[in-house]
């Protein structure tokens, strides 16, 4: 009987051992070939991917970084090392963690790691632990500007670039501000060679063109506004305030002098600035500003248009004298000049006996050439030179002179000056407004 009890106990123990052995084998078989490392299990890896789809993993990452992330690029696209997937994975002692992309972490055997790296199958070996990150300065949580690194990857800040360089041991530098790729730097604008100072000839030509323009405006004004016998006295200018040049230049000066201080300030001169078409207009008026105060007085304005060397008839006479060199030029035409150096209205050729009419620049008037003497009306304008104002008056002054009567014994008109009232000025302004000039 005792022997039977011993055999029964032994049989029960053997059965228990068999059951436990099978249970352990079943557990071992479920672990797969990687014995004991559940992190290498495919089911666990799929769970990591599921976390990514559910947005659990990304909440630990930099939102501003992944906003610009391109999954098609390799992993060395400058992930934030502090958010590396391997930091959350703990491999067995004989394995090391590597990342296959920005969301997948794998535990790989150390003995298989080096051969796979040589073949290039593993993108990058990551840190065994966070010890390498201790020496790198972390970046503050603050909004910053994105930069492009020398490795061709975009970083959310310069600090992130430096952190990545520190943690990986790479030598990185900032190529440009903003995301990669860096746009080519625009070529520095080719500055046009600054225009050299205007020559005296250019200034004289410009002054001559401006005088012609002022003359045309003045002529149109006198043609449109015809003073009548009833309002002539009230509508004429007070000649005592006119500049020293009393032709179209004086008329233009008074048109520009809006505050009637006999000075043209820059705002008043700007009314005739044509920089786009006349690049020398500013140099012209700057050269006339003798006192360098930024304003033109009436004398400076008049002198501005009588630069020496700009007198057409006098220049022609000088040219003829140089050609003759003391010899008599028989049969040659010799022009007639006035005291200001411009052409007289009537010109005659002594050899042919023909006469014709010209303007002050010597241009012949069409149909005026005749055999013998011709009657040419003298110009109503002079060059604007000093002293020329006494011989020529404005058209509206001529109408006024006809009412005053004959000249005195010395041939001078008897002019009675009177003060200009505010009502007279208002009437004159109203007439000017009706014309509608465009300066």
From Swiss-Prot:
<dbReference type="GO" id="GO:0005201">
    <property type="term" value="F:extracellular matrix structural constituent"/>
</dbReference>
<feature type="domain" description="Kazal-like">
    <location>
        <begin position="130"/>
        <end position="182"/>
    </location>
</feature>
<dbReference type="GO" id="GO:0005509">
    <property type="term" value="F:calcium ion binding"/>
</dbReference>
<dbReference type="Pfam" id="PF10591">
    <property type="entry name" value="SPARC_Ca_bdg"/>
</dbReference>
<dbReference type="GO" id="GO:0001764">
    <property type="term" value="P:neuron migration"/>
</dbReference>
<dbReference type="GO" id="GO:0005615">
    <property type="term" value="C:extracellular space"/>
</dbReference>
<keyword id="KW-0272">Extracellular matrix</keyword>
<feature type="disulfide bond">
    <location>
        <begin position="86"/>
        <end position="97"/>
    </location>
</feature>
<dbReference type="GO" id="GO:0001558">
    <property type="term" value="P:regulation of cell growth"/>
</dbReference>
<dbReference type="GO" id="GO:0005737">
    <property type="term" value="C:cytoplasm"/>
</dbReference>
<dbReference type="GO" id="GO:0007399">
    <property type="term" value="P:nervous system development"/>
</dbReference>
<dbReference type="GO" id="GO:0010812">
    <property type="term" value="P:negative regulation of cell-substrate adhesion"/>
</dbReference>
<dbReference type="InterPro" id="IPR000716">
    <property type="entry name" value="Thyroglobulin_1"/>
</dbReference>
<dbReference type="GO" id="GO:0033268">
    <property type="term" value="C:node of Ranvier"/>
</dbReference>
<dbReference type="GO" id="GO:0031594">
    <property type="term" value="C:neuromuscular junction"/>
</dbReference>
<feature type="disulfide bond">
    <location>
        <begin position="313"/>
        <end position="337"/>
    </location>
</feature>
<feature type="glycosylation site" description="O-linked (Xyl...) (glycosaminoglycan) serine">
    <location>
        <position position="383"/>
    </location>
</feature>
<dbReference type="GO" id="GO:0005518">
    <property type="term" value="F:collagen binding"/>
</dbReference>
<protein>
    <recommendedName>
        <fullName>Testican-1</fullName>
    </recommendedName>
</protein>
<feature type="region of interest" description="Disordered">
    <location>
        <begin position="415"/>
        <end position="439"/>
    </location>
</feature>
<feature type="glycosylation site" description="O-linked (Xyl...) (glycosaminoglycan) serine">
    <location>
        <position position="388"/>
    </location>
</feature>
<keyword id="KW-0654">Proteoglycan</keyword>
<feature type="signal peptide">
    <location>
        <begin position="1"/>
        <end position="21"/>
    </location>
</feature>
<dbReference type="GO" id="GO:0062023">
    <property type="term" value="C:collagen-containing extracellular matrix"/>
</dbReference>
<dbReference type="GO" id="GO:0010977">
    <property type="term" value="P:negative regulation of neuron projection development"/>
</dbReference>
<dbReference type="InterPro" id="IPR036058">
    <property type="entry name" value="Kazal_dom_sf"/>
</dbReference>
<feature type="compositionally biased region" description="Acidic residues">
    <location>
        <begin position="422"/>
        <end position="439"/>
    </location>
</feature>
<feature type="domain" description="Thyroglobulin type-1">
    <location>
        <begin position="310"/>
        <end position="376"/>
    </location>
</feature>
<dbReference type="InterPro" id="IPR011992">
    <property type="entry name" value="EF-hand-dom_pair"/>
</dbReference>
<keyword id="KW-0325">Glycoprotein</keyword>
<feature type="disulfide bond">
    <location>
        <begin position="348"/>
        <end position="355"/>
    </location>
</feature>
<dbReference type="GO" id="GO:0016528">
    <property type="term" value="C:sarcoplasm"/>
</dbReference>
<dbReference type="GO" id="GO:0007155">
    <property type="term" value="P:cell adhesion"/>
</dbReference>
<dbReference type="GO" id="GO:0008191">
    <property type="term" value="F:metalloendopeptidase inhibitor activity"/>
</dbReference>
<feature type="glycosylation site" description="O-linked (GalNAc...) threonine">
    <location>
        <position position="228"/>
    </location>
</feature>
<dbReference type="InterPro" id="IPR036857">
    <property type="entry name" value="Thyroglobulin_1_sf"/>
</dbReference>
<keyword id="KW-0357">Heparan sulfate</keyword>
<comment type="function">
    <text>May play a role in cell-cell and cell-matrix interactions. May contribute to various neuronal mechanisms in the central nervous system.</text>
</comment>
<dbReference type="InterPro" id="IPR019577">
    <property type="entry name" value="SPARC/Testican_Ca-bd-dom"/>
</dbReference>
<dbReference type="GO" id="GO:0014069">
    <property type="term" value="C:postsynaptic density"/>
</dbReference>
<dbReference type="GO" id="GO:0021953">
    <property type="term" value="P:central nervous system neuron differentiation"/>
</dbReference>
<dbReference type="Pfam" id="PF00086">
    <property type="entry name" value="Thyroglobulin_1"/>
</dbReference>
């Amino acid at each position: 009987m005792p022997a039977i009890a011993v055999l029964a106990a032994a049989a029960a123990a053997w059965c228990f051992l068999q059951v436990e052995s099978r249970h352990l084998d079943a557990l071992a078989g479920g672990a797969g070939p990687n014995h004991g490392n559940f992190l290498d299990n495919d089911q666990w890896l799929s769970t990591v991917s599921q976390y990514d789809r559910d947005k659990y993993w990304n909440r630990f990452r930099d939102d501003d970084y992944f906003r610009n992330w391109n999954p098609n690029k390799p992993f060395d696209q400058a992930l934030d090392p502090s958010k590396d997937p391997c930091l959350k994975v703990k491999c067995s002692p004989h394995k090391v963690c590597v990342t296959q992309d920005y969301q997948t972490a794998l535990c790989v055997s150390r003995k298989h790691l080096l051969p796979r790296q040589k073949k290039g199958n593993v993108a990058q070996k990551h840190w065994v632990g966070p010890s390498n990150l201790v020496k790198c300065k972390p970046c503050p949580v603050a909004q910053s500007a994105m930069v492009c690194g020398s490795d061709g990857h975009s970083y959310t800040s310069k600090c992130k670039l430096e952190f990545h360089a520190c943690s990986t041991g790479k030598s990185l530098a900032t190529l440009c501000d903003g995301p990669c790729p860096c746009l080519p730097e625009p070529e520095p604008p080719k500055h046009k060679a600054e225009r050299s100072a205007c020559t005296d000839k250019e200034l004289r030509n410009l002054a001559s063109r401006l005088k012609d323009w002022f003359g045309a405006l003045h002529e149109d004004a006198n043609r449109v506004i015809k003073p009548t016998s009833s309002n002539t006295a009230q509508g004429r200018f007070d000649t005592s305030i006119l500049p020293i040049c009393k032709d179209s230049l004086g008329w233009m000066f008074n048109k520009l002098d809006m505050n009637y201080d006999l000075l043209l300030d820059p705002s008043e001169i700007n009314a005739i600035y044509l920089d786009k078409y006349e690049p020398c207009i500013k140099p012209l008026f700057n050269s006339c500003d003798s006192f360098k105060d930024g304003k033109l007085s009436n004398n400076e304005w008049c002198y501005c248009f009588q630069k020496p060397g700009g007198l057409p008839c006098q220049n022609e006479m000088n040219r003829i004298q140089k050609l003759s060199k003391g010899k008599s030029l028989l049969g040659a035409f010799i022009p007639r000049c006035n005291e200001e150096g411009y052409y007289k209205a009537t010109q005659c050729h002594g050899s042919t006996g023909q006469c014709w009419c010209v303007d002050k620049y010597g241009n012949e008037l069409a149909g005026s050439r005749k055999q013998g003497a011709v009657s040419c009306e003298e110009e109503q304008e002079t060059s604007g030179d000093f002293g020329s104002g006494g011989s020529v008056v404005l058209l509206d002054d001529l109408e006024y002179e006809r009412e005053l009567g004959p000249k005195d014994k010395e041939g001078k008109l008897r002019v009675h000056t009177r003060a200009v009232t505010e009502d007279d000025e208002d009437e004159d302004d109203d007439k000017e407004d009706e014309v509608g000039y465009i300066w």
